[in-house]
Amino acid sequence: MSFQIYNWLEKYVHEVVSTFGYRIWFIGVQGSYARGEATEESDIDVVLILDTLLPADLRIYRGMLNRLPYREKICGFISGREELENWSKADLFQFCQDTMPLKGSLDEIVAKLDMADVRRSS
C-alpha cells in the first residue's frame, strides 16, 4: 500500500486537535506535498501555530508525533502566534505563500502586509 498524504494529513490534524484543542491557531503543510511535487523520499513539512507556545508543548507535540505513522518523514515546525507575528514582514509573506492551510487561516497576517514587504521577500 502506498503512502497517501491526504489520509495522513487528516490523521495528523485529528491528533493535533485531540492534543491541543482550542489552543490551535493554525495548521498547515509546506514543501513538496503542498506544491504537489512530492516523491517517495519526500518529507512531510507540517506547521503548527498555537495561541502561545510553552516549553511543555514541545514535549507533548513530540510524543504526539511519535504516535503517528511515517514518523521518520515528519519535519516542519511548531510556534506560538506571537513569535510568528514577530517575524519580518518579508519572511511572513514568503511563509504565507509557501503554506497550504489545513485548519485556520493566515488571512490576518496577509492583511498586514504591503507591496514593500512583497518586494523585500524576493
Indicate residue ranges for each PLM-predicted region:
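Catalytic core of pol beta-like nucleotidyltransferases
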Residues: 1-23, 34-41, 51-122
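Glycine-rich beta-strand-to-loop/alpha-helix junction loops that act as flexible
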Residues: 30-32
